[in-house]
């Protein structure tokens, strides 16, 4: 059993945490709602969650109606490549993140999980487009630091997405058309009781429609479709939800004929097909009996990805390459909460987590195949105390990992202390949380550890001044039992791993840490004028080396900054109908992702491995992509009519067409390091209509 460092254990004797009426900075003003009103829209599993609204997903620039891209505007979050929604949270690898839907853990719910990655390999944590439609979501949240005792299996960020129920009185429709895709949503009651509803949404990609008509983009055709369904039933004191998310995507690249067109990079030597499928099913419920409440559910989800790379012209040095990655996840949880009196409440529960992943990687003359996974059972208990501006929760979680070569059992204390006075608040959050090492287990066997424990401490001060809130946060994370591999004498930890590495390295024990400071301010109101939200963070992510020194990790970007500004102008048209013009502007900047040297792949195999040359880290992450900067713009016009509300919007990502470096790889055809750039100016026009 691994115990949280003893110097922090005395804090367990301190009352701690959360103020449910705490002011929260939003994109358009300040959430300052009574507790009951907040709960009517989104009940965060913990006040630690930074909640966001679906309206913000629709309104803010650069989101493309993807909640993950909205989360990229939050403090401490870096979008690793703007072609996709992989997020590094406070210097952690995106593999440290976890997606939850209605409180249940699910697999990566994104199409084209290979988007924006180093060698077009699929990943376990992000992708180009989210398969969960924003039209299905209620207001949701994101946890970037400590977790409540109910949640685990993530040491980076946790997406806490919530499905909204359908309308229980009459049928309603929504339709949306744009350069991302075409959506059609239908919701309405089932029966006459007014207690049961359905909500379904179907979507097909705009690029897929163009591909069906024979149009491609630089030799590539990209398609995706998804279908979301939610059945909801409520009764006095309780509710039941059944949901499903299914979809598929493909990205097909046709290499040019070298006799007709000059080859400019190694990619053009091949025909490349990428296909993926996602399936997510779940059930969640809650019920209250007097002072007792019960909630829980289960989910089953899986993803299947298949990438094939066939040479346009067969030759001994241009072999085919195939890669499949098929993760699956089953999750179940149950929580019992009891309100003891006006000051105390108690919670007790358990979470079951079973994750398996299989893969096959073939380079022509050789390859790798296998699987990885683990099963975990985590009972937990918590106590909440609140009085006179002080709210406290103390919890302990016991995460047990088995069905691995080495079993692990972690005690994970969770404490969170917050005190409010005179429009100010001070919060201390201390805890530990663990996660299994799936990506690392796929790359090497055996591992020194199959699950790791991360300790963290967050200290946050906030103050409200009129319509404005300012916040300052200090945080640190430590993973003393991390794993990594050595390249010469340099240790590359798991915190620098996102994609598959074809070298199959031998892993060793490692120690990692992340620490930083965040400053944030927000205020104004879209109802009354201009509003803004801005943040800046300074941070480091490091791994201890053999000589005891600390070296920067891949996602140690040094700094990140965001600023969003917006305003709406309501008016009446000539027929006295409501019309609103809106403007939103966002600036995003951060330090560059780090990388090693790009060199040829030396291997005894004479096959396509040379087209997937891994970086040389013998001298560490000595290079950087340089400062990233991107301005986004969104203009929209909303018309409210008797039976409909329509919105015409122009969303422009990278409005200044800034050239940002994405990565540097070794091109075996050109025989030199080659730069890839992130997205330039991307205009997205959309039209949305809601029938009331």
Predicted features, each with a name:
Residues 22-60, 64, 68, 94, ...:
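Short, acidic, small-residue-rich periplasmic hinge/interaction motif at the N-terminus
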Residues 68-110, 139:
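Extracytoplasmic beta-strand/coil segments of soluble accessory domains associated
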Residues 110, 257, 261, 405, ...:
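Surface-exposed extracellular loop regions of Gram-negative outer-membrane beta-barrel proteins
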Residues 121-172, 183:
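A beta-strand signature from Gram-negative outer-membrane beta-barrel systems
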Residues 178-204, 217-254, 271-300, 332, ...:
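Transmembrane beta-barrel wall of Gram-negative outer-membrane proteins
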Residues 323-335, 370-380, 450, 456, ...:
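Outer membrane beta-barrel strand-and-loop segments of large Gram-negative receptors
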Residues 386-390, 476, 501-593:
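Gram-negative outer-membrane beta-barrel transporters
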Residues 589-612, 626-630, 637-692:
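C-terminal beta-signal and adjacent terminal beta-strands/loops
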């Amino acid at each position: 059993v691994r115990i949280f460092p003893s110097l922090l254990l005395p804090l367990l004797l301190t009352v701690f945490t959360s103020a449910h009426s705490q002011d929260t900075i939003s994109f358009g003003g300040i959430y300052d709602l009574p507790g009951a009103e907040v709960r009517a829209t989104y009940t965060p599993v913990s006040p630690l969650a930074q909640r966001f609204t679906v309206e913000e997903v629709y309104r803010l620039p650069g989101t493309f109606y993807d909640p993950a891209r909205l989360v990229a505007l939050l403090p401490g979050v870096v979008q690793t490549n703007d072609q996709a929604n992989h997020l590094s949270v406070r210097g952690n690898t995106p593999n440290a993140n976890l997606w939850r839907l209605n409180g249940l853990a699910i697999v990566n719910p994104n199409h084209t999980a290979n988007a924006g990655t180093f060698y077009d390999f699929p990943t376990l944590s992000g992708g180009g487009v989210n398969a969960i439609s924003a039209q299905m979501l209620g207001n949701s949240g994101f946890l970037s630091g400590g977790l409540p005792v109910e949640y685990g299996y993530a040491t980076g960020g946790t997406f806490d997405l919530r499905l909204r129920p359908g309308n229980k009185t009459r049928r309603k429709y929504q339709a949306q058309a744009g350069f991302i895709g075409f959506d059609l949503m239908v919701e309405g009651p089932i029966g006459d009781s007014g207690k049961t509803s359905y909500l379904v949404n179907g979507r097909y990609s705009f690029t897929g429609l163009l591909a069906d008509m024979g149009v491609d983009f630089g030799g590539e055709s990209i398609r995706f479709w998804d279908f979301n369904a939610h059945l909801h039933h409520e009764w006095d004191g309780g509710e039941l939800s059944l949901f499903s998310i299914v979809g598929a995507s493909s990205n097909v690249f046709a290499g040019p004929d070298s006799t007709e067109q000059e080859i400019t990079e190694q990619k053009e030597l091949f025909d490349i097909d990428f296909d993926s499928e996602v399936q997510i099913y779940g059930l969640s419920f809650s019920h209250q009996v007097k002072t007792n409440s019960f909630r829980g559910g289960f989910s089953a989800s899986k993803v299947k990805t298949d990438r094939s790379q066939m040479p346009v012209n067969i030759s001994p040095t241009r072999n085919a390459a195939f890669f499949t990655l098929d993760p699956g996840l089953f999750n179940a949880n149950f929580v019992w909460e009891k309100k003891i009196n006006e000051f105390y409440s108690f919670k007790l529960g358990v979470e079951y987590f079973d994750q398996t992943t299989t893969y096959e990687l073939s380079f022509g003359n050789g390859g790798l195949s296998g699987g990885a996974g683990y099963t975990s059972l985590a009972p937990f208990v918590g106590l909440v105390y609140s009085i006179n501006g002080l709210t406290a929760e103390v919890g302990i979680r016991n995460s047990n990992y088995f069905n691995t070569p080495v079993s692990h059992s972690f005690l994970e204390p969770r404490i969170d202390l917050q005190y409010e006075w005179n429009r100010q608040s001070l919060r201390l959050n201390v805890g530990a949380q663990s996660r299994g090492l799936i990506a690392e287990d796929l790359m090497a066997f055996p591992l020194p550890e199959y699950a790791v424990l991360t300790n963290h401490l967050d200290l946050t001060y906030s103050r409200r001044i009129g319509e404005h809130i300012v916040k300052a946060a200090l945080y640190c994370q430590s993973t003393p039992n991390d794993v990594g591999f050595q390249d010469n004498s340099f240790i590359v930890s798991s915190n620098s791993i996102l994609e598959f590495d074809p070298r199959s390295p031998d892993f060793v024990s490692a120690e990692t840490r992340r620490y930083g400071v965040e400053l944030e301010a927000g205020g104004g109101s879209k109802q009354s004028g201009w509003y803004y939200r801005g943040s800046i963070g300074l941070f480091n992510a490091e791994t201890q080396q053999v000589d005891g020194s600390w070296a920067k990790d891949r996602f140690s970007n040094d700094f990140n900054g965001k600023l969003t500004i917006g305003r709406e102008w309501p008016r009446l048209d000539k027929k006295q109908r409501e019309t609103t013009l809106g403007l939103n502007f966002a600036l995003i900047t951060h330090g560059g992702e780090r990388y090693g040297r790009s060199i040829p792949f030396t291997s005894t195999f004479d096959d396509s491995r040379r087209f997937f040359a891994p970086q040389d880290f013998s001298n560490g992450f000595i290079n950087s992509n340089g400062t990233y900067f991107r301005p986004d713009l969104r203009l929209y016009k909303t018309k409210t009519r008797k039976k409909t509300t329509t919105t015409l919007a122009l969303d422009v990502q990278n409005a200044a067409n800034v050239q940002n470096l994405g990565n540097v790889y070794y091109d075996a055809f050109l025989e030199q390091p080659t730069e890839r750039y992130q997205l330039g100016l991307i205009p997205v026009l959309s039209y949305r209509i809601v029938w009331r």
